[in-house]
Amino acid sequence: MSPRISALLLPVLALLALPARSDVVTLTPIKDATIYNDTVGNRCDSKGLTMYAGQAGTNTTWPTRRAMVAFDVSAVPAGSTVTSVQVKLYMSKTVVGAKTFTLHKLTRGWNEGPTVGFSGDGNSAQVGDPTWLHTYFNNQLWTTPGGDFVATASASLSIGSTYQYYTWGSTAQLVADVQSWIDNPSTNYGWIVRGPEGGAKSAKQFETRESLARYRPQIVVTYTPPPPTAYCTAKTNSLGCVPAIGSTGSADFNAGSGFAITLSNTLNQKAGLLFYGTLGPATAPFQGGTMCVQAPIQRTVAQNSGGSASPANDCTGSFSYDFNVLIASGANSQLSVGRLVCAQYWSRDPAATFTTNLSNALRFYIYP
């Protein structure tokens, strides 16, 4: 290969070598609580500033306590691939040295009730609280007292001195847990936190979502978002060409530019425009083609397809619209981080049924 050709190929090869884009989101809980091994299931702490895990001393009737915490991971777009998960809890009180605490994936839904516990012993349960026996006091039960969860820990961590965040580092199982919640949101019940139980003191106090913002539980999720994906069927135009939608770049809430939604193989020197919606895809017959975007739709500015100059009549036309410019303009508040957008081109085709053409469509998410 000549040096000149090699030089021309270098930018292309560099683009091909770029790693897949990764995004990171930090989330706080949607619910957390402590349950206590009260044999009649009448003890909990749902709305307190702190939660507890491990074994307390013998001066209490219910020494074993377990903390539960769940996070809404819907900020990670559906179809994403999770690559790393870290779980962070702020530990604010202990009377023992370092102990190992584990996270276990919960397998049954539970409710964060109204009860506030003002100490490590919690308080009497009220309707809607979780307890050692109940997912929802006092008429919905765990299958197994103490909570239904996967026996094998998703992560473990030695926790020692107070007044600091402790981070369970990413493990294959933590990644699998969060991936399963993204793929199947109805199974997202969170984790239960356990310390050594049944023997010597081991209990630790952690801050909850009701605490000050700087102490609240967190998860940090790193993920590879799904690429823009073409779907639906384009209407064949009057010359027998099938327009094809495409894109370069990605929809970025903060970029300001750099996400071109394109259309090729369309009629030359014709008016057209990109339209879009945020309520998902559709497959409805429309003007001899298919409406691929769920109403209501929004239109962008009209363009000319260019291509061969008149009087030529061919399929050398094309369109391009930088969607990041629209996002950055703030003209549509629905174009927010994590939003699914579906987009499609409409263009003039004077010799076709209804004198119009509809392309196939593109679905994509807006990333932070």
Q: What spans do the regions from the language model cover?
A:
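Extended extracellular/luminal ectodomain segments enriched in beta-structured repeat modules
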Residues: 64-66, 76-86, 254-257, 267-270
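Acidic glycine-/aspartate-rich tracts in secreted/extracellular proteins
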Residues: 74-78, 92-95, 107-114, 175-176, ...
